[in-house]
């Protein structure tokens, strides 16, 4: 996804467009101005960018502490066993704007080519809001060009289109959806959640889907679709599916009590039910991924996992749900 090095010329362009659109009002058949309907989430750091390291096809523009933060997002798959101790990084969740009805969402422009029209609908738009809107539009419109082989992706702007997209990516409408609904909802300025936790149970959501190729007796991992909420004036999700991938429901119990693991970090709940996704084939990831650099490993040598946010959704075919994972 987007790097940490901001393009100053792009910022100037956004600022110019924002100035031009301050007094613009666009009607799309609704009496109520859309900018009055939705709470905004643009006054705080967008923790979607914490997962820059998950966009494995691009160079990571980060240095020093930022590189360490990206490295901390990931962990080895072996840690997902009862009895292990883990220090998860789970980006905070504030709130998700409401989904629009499908007929309304489909009538609203949603593309980088219509960026000026989109901004006009939410005028007056701050520069931060304009940047996040543009980033979401670019993610949904241009991300396909940077997909890894075998990866599929798309964006959904309504609840109905979200279900349809997941079914399309999985190739079946008989699906199950999982989310970490019990994770806390945080204040807008809350940093990433950290803390030492005991892994007490791990349940695989994506079972092995039959046998593998004719040349191997190993089972082939089932399809998994992960959907991540984007910062936007109304609910928008970016969904993608990459094989081979495994998804887990993980119960975490605090190994220590009190505040966060470091200065300014969120207080650690005593217990969390979280979702984790593991990428089983990292051979096509960049060698400069912060996790690889921090641990001295190369692409393809290890499976890499990360936790999902409260609002992220994991979809799997209904008949492929797995069971508990054994302790080491």
Curated annotation (Swiss-Prot):
PROSITE patterns: BURP
InterPro entries found in the cross-reference section: BURP, BURP_dom
Domain of life: Eukaryota
BURP domain location: 74-318
Pfam family, one: BURP
Tissue spec. comment: Expressed in roots.
Protein name, per record: BURP domain-containing protein 11
Species the sequence originates in: Oryza sativa subsp. japonica (Rice)
Lineage: Eukaryota, Viridiplantae, Streptophyta, Embryophyta, Tracheophyta
Encoding gene, per UniProt annotation: BURP11
